[in-house]
Amino acid sequence: EGNADFIIDDFKEASINTDYILTSENEETGQAFITVTDEGQNTILVYGGANMTLNAEDVNHGEQAIREADFVVAQLEIPIEAIEQAFKIAKAHGVTTILNPAPAIDLPDSLLSLTDIIIPNETEAERLSGISIKNEADMQQTVDYFFERGISTVLITLGEQGTYFATQHDSHIVPAYQVKAIDTTAAGDTFIGAFVSRLERDLSNLEDAIRFANQASSLTVQRKGAQASIPTYKEVTAQYQ
């Protein structure tokens, strides 16, 4: 339907490769309906639509792209089956897998064990681990939960506080840039995209990539809208300190 054509054209205009996008004859394009409070906080109602029909066989059609990627990134607005298949292909070819477990749902260990880097917010981290994060000890216990399931790098986004990250060798908070938020819609998505776009394949610049992502998100929350509020790589680079 019209939304599919509009979105694909929008991607092409942004120089995004659309070769592996599939279209459905039976389902409409997924949509998100967003409300924003006066304080800039949002509530999102999602209609999955065609997104929720993606399966392992569909993912196999994109195997070449996965094999050649620096990173494979997924969130939870497609079926778990599809994510697991994409991550299995990635792991088989030495490609780093990154999971943004949003929206917050329970996840099988089979998916977590295929994940190299996980990036939840506090709510999502608590949902997965069952640990209420109230202090640094709770944070470390949450990180250990993910480590025990084979995940090597954990980033927990903390809103205006910044991002807590942990590896087997280091852990601390990377502070956020202090700005006045108008609309927090797309802040998390901006963080993920900016982080991955900056990250070196060997993860050697992990903290730099987090700072860059924090900068990108700080620009997003000062603007209204979802996709329209997301800055370009060039915009973020110009602001990055």
Q: Positions of the model-derived regions?
A:
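Conserved phosphate-binding/catalytic loop of the ribokinase/pfkB sugar-kinase fold
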Residues: 19-24, 34-71, 76
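Substrate-binding N-lobe of the ribokinase-like
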Residues: 1-31, 239
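Short gly/ser/thr-rich secondary-structure transition/capping motifs
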Residues: 15, 52-57, 97-103
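Short beta-strand scaffold segments in enzyme catalytic cores
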Residues: 31-35, 43, 162-166
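Anion (oxyanion) recognition and catalysis
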Residues: 12, 91, 147
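Conserved phosphate-binding/catalytic region of the ribokinase-like
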Residues: 105-110, 136-241
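Conserved beta-alpha-beta core of the PfkB/ribokinase-like small-molecule kinase fold
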Residues: 71-141, 162
